[in-house]
Structures are given as C-alpha cells and as structure tokens.
C-alpha cells in the first residue's frame, strides 16, 4: 500500500519501539493527523480473550464525558405512548413494522437502534442485517428497554457500545482531532475503565495486550496498556 508523503512524514514522528502514555499518544495523534477535515480519533485494543467462547465475550457501554464529536442518529422501535416518548427525546426515526420494512429494503442511515421489549419479535426479522453491524438492540447495552427516552438521550449524549470482534479486537471512537488533549484523555480513560471492568472471569493471562491510538488515515500511536491512573500526568502507575 502506497502512503502519501504527509502520512510518511507523520509516521516518522512516531517511535515504534516506544509505548507512549495516553497523554503523549493523544498529543502525537493530534500532531500527526494529515487530513484536511476534522479527523476522528479511535482507540484499538487487542484483548487476551477467545471470543468464540461464550464466557469470554467482552461487550458493554461507555459514557464518553465529552461525546464523540458527532451526534448519533438514533432509531427507536416502539408504539403508542413509548413512541411519543422517543420522539420527544429526539429520536431520528420511530416506528414498528414500517421501520423493519425500510431496513429490509436496505436503509441503514442510523448509528444506534433502541427497542421496547414487545418489539423484539418483529426485529428478529432483521437480526441478520443489524447483528453483524453492531446495531441489534440488546438488554445488556441498555437498548432493549421501556425507558426509551433515557436510552435516546444517553446515546445522543455520547454513550457508545463496544463488542470484541472475532479477532479479539475492540475499536472505539474517542472523539475528534479538534478536541483538546484533556478531552481526548478523559474519553480514553472512560473507555479504558469500562473495558477493564468488562474483563471476563474466564479470561486467563494478560487481558490488555496491545493499545493503539489512530486518527482517520493517520499512523497508529502505540500506547502503554499498563498506564491506568494519573493519565493526564502520564504516570506509569497501574
């Protein structure tokens, strides 16, 4: 793969043999973004789990203190009073059978889906579409609920879901390059806290194997996975 001159210049600023503290990594990621738009900042984590085993699945949600920099488009499967609550809370689309039909027809212009429990049988018809994209409502992530208003406002406010993929990796957005270093470190700390909290008891050996911070089309910055406390100061205490 041929990288651009700006990418190669950015990559040269990163010492591949070093593990950076979160504060250092955020600073470098912001400095090495080479695109002309406001790049997305993402953290990738390699976990010491076998996701093929049910007792080693890692999933959960995290409330990013400063959001993702993007307002999520949220749809809600609900009827009656619950549908009205969802609309009032700011849901982008609300419906039942007609929403299912639109998705069956190929419409996927949303970032999160919420459902009341009574709608789950209908949503089963589109599980094959939503599941692989991480969009299937699930009680564990608070997206199958009677409290649709809270679920909508949480997601709009920066709550994101995470789930380990079949290669034992997690990918989470922690903001935009335009965020301050402190905001990105705060969001990273929130993500790290929830991922550590989600560690399965069946997981043996080193849990957090590798952490990399990247921006859109930018080089990866290796982060020390052992730095948990004092993130702003970059202390290596864990």
Swiss-Prot record:
InterPro entries: Ribosom_uL1_bac-type, Ribosomal_uL1, Ribosomal_uL1-like, Ribosomal_uL1/biogenesis, Ribosomal_uL1_3-a/b-sand, Ribosomal_uL1_CS. PROSITE patterns: RIBOSOMAL_L1. One of its GO terms (biological process) is translation. The keyword Repressor applies. Part of the 50S ribosomal subunit. Binds directly to 23S rRNA. The L1 stalk is quite mobile in the ribosome, and is involved in E site tRNA release. This is Large ribosomal subunit protein uL1. The gene is rplA.
């Amino acid at each position: 793969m041929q990288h651009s001159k700006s990418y190669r210049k950015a990559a040269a600023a990163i010492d591949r043999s070093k593990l950076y503290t979160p504060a250092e990594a955020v600073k470098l990621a912001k400095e090495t973004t080479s695109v002309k738009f406001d790049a997305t900042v993402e953290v990738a984590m390699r976990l010491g789990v076998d996701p093929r085993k049910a007792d080693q699945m890692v999933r959960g949600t995290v409330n990013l203190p400063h959001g993702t920099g993007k307002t999520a488009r949220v749809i809600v499967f609900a009827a009656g009073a619950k549908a009205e609550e969802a609309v009032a809370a700011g849901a982008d689309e609300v419906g039942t059978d007609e929403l299912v039909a639109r998705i069956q027809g190929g419409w996927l212009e949303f970032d999160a889906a919420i459902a009341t429990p009574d709608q789950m049988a209908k949503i089963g018809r589109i599980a094959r579409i939503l599941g692989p994209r991480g969009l299937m409502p699930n009680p564990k992530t608070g997206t199958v609920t009677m409290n649709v208003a809270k679920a909508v406002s949480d997601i709009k406010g920066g709550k994101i879901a995470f789930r380990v993929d079949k290669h034992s990796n997690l990918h989470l957005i922690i903001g935009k390059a335009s965020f301050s270093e402190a905001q990105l470190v705060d969001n990273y700390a929130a993500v790290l806290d929830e991922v550590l909290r989600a560690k399965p008891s069946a997981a043996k050996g080193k849990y957090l194997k590798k952490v990399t911070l990247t921006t859109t089309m930018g080089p990866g910055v290796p982060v020390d996975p052992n730095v948990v406390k004092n993130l702003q100061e970059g202390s290596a205490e864990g």
